[in-house]
């Protein structure tokens, strides 16, 4: 039996900080600097706390100053979501480069898990995105989030709708695991071992899906 590839370390779960510090005020406000400030704000305060006035306070300015660069809170949140999606896509493409099948799946899953724990606010923004909608740019970004995984699934012989559904199933499993970790449900369990086992079982299911014509056997 071939040796199983080793899962990367998730880098551990960071402990909550003692106090929230203000984000340094940008030398000059721009849409990009506001989005950057919002990303830092998210990890410190959380998605539900993100408002124009709260972010402006963290940036050392007033709310009206931000409206010179963003149209509304929803415009800001949309820009943040798209930025987070782009960052995750870049990360998955980087760690998965040159890898295939179980090796790629394990490495990408580990990177996804690590990102969620080290950037909880950004991860929350990512998982609140709809998969469709009336905004072409946003819809394209959300669909693009599955692209790195779909590319890896092609090494199992999956493509088209079959690969897209498999990617959604894979994402659902990772998201569920990460949420359980974040809520502390599995604090007394060797989560690294459980995570590796889960990902390898998912990979085996992809293999069976190809063998059995699109349906993973049980």
From Swiss-Prot:
Give the start-end ranges of region Disordered. 1-24
Q: Which residues carry this modification: Phosphothreonine?
A: 57
Keywords in alphabetical order: DNA-binding, Phosphoprotein, Transcription, Transcription regulation
**Keyword Protein biosynthesis part of the UniProt annotation:** no
Q: Name one GO biological process term.
A: regulation of DNA-templated transcription
Q: Which residues bind DNA?
A: 51-70
Annotated GO molecular function terms are: DNA-binding transcription factor activity; transcription cis-regulatory region binding
* Residues covered by the HTH tetR-type domain: 28-88
| UniProt xrefs under PROSITE patterns | HTH_TETR_2
The keyword Mitochondrion is assigned to this record: no
One CC-aspect GO term: plasma membrane
Q: Which residues cross the membrane?
A: none
Tell me the superkingdom of the source: Bacteria
PTM details? Phosphorylated on Thr-57 by PknH.
Q: What is this protein called?
A: Uncharacterized HTH-type transcriptional regulator Rv0681
Which organism is this protein's natural source? Answer: Mycobacterium tuberculosis (strain ATCC 25618 / H37Rv)
């Amino acid at each position: 039996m071939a040796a199983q590839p080793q899962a990367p370390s998730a880098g551990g779960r960071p402990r909550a900080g003692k106090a929230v510090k203000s984000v340094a005020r940008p030398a000059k406000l721009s849409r990009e600097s506001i989005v950057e400030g919002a990303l830092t704000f998210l990890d410190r305060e959380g998605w539900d706390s993100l408002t124009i006035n709260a972010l402006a306070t963290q940036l050392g300015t007033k709310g009206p100053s931000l409206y010179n660069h963003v149209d509304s809170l929803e415009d800001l949140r949309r820009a943040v979501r798209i930025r987070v999606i782009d960052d995750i896509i870049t990360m998955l493409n980087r760690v998965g480069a040159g890898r295939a099948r179980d090796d790629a799946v394990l490495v990408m899953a580990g990177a996804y898990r690590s990102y969620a724990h080290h950037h909880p606010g950004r991860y929350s923004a990512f998982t609140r995105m709809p998969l469709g909608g009336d905004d072409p740019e946003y819809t394209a970004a959300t669909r693009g989030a599955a692209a790195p995984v779909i590319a890896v699934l092609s090494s199992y012989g999956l493509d088209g709708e079959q690969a897209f559904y498999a990617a959604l199933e894979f994402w659902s499993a990772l998201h569920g695991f990460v949420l359980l970790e974040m809520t502390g449900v599995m604090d007394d369990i060797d989560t690294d071992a459980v995570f590796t086992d889960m990902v390898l079982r998912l990979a085996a299911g992809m293999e069976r899906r190809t063998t059995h014509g699109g349906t993973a056997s049980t």
